[in-house]
Amino acid sequence: MRTLEPVSSDLMRESQYLREIMGLDPVTDHNRIVYLDTCFEFPWDTTRALELALFRTFAVPSVAAVLDASGEFDRRAQKRYDDTDLILSTIVEAGYDSDDGKRAIRQMNRIHGRFEIANEDFLYVLSSFVFEPIRWNARFGWRPLVEAERLATFQFWLEVGRRMAIKEIPATYEELQRFNQEYERANFRPTEEARRVGLATRDMFLAWFPGLPKRFGAQAIYALMDEPLLAAFGFPRPPRPVRAAVEASLRTRARAVALLPPRRNPRLRTRRKTRSYGQDWQLEELGPA
């Protein structure tokens, strides 16, 4: 079982967003809490955590087999990343029951409907969207998530899962966390499909930094992975000094961010210039042709 490693309490800066969150109900106000966390408090951390969450799902043989057979990662890894990012970001930024949120979920369901995916696999992917941001922030965020934020994250993705028609979603945070951990122990294992998808995803990330030596960049990516994930992809264990350096740099960043004033404007990923589309895209056009 992976345990959370809380950052020091001296990183707990006060912000108007945290004050607002502490006054909200994590069940009835979960849309607002997740929006504040994703777009104001932790935009960079949430993105990195969800990237790692998606990486973890590829270690599941049945998921990797579907993705590998589709050819999307081998030929269009960046487009696949941008499609996923824009759909999920729309749901978070607009809210799952807004017009755009409903369109995003409808498009996501249309894409998934082309493949034979087990309910348990859907449920694991959903659980990774809940727990990877929580784990990331506990290790590398400028503050860990408070209980209201953790419960709101669970409630938000619970509601998204219901709108995706995912069945048998655990009713509590603790039950979903237990499912997440038990599922990984039972299902993570090396396959050729997982290796191909993992390599394609790794190389996509490395392409973002063309001036960085590939060997060093790859080791930095491996340093963010635990042993079961490395084994599932057949990736080498990074040298201990590399892992220590990567973790130290992320903690240094956290301390620097903690000294900055709260963000004034939301960081909206749906407004950013994507590598695949620029800023010209429509929800209904995302996904495989």
Model-found features: residue ranges?
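Mature, function-bearing regions of proteins
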Residues: 1-289
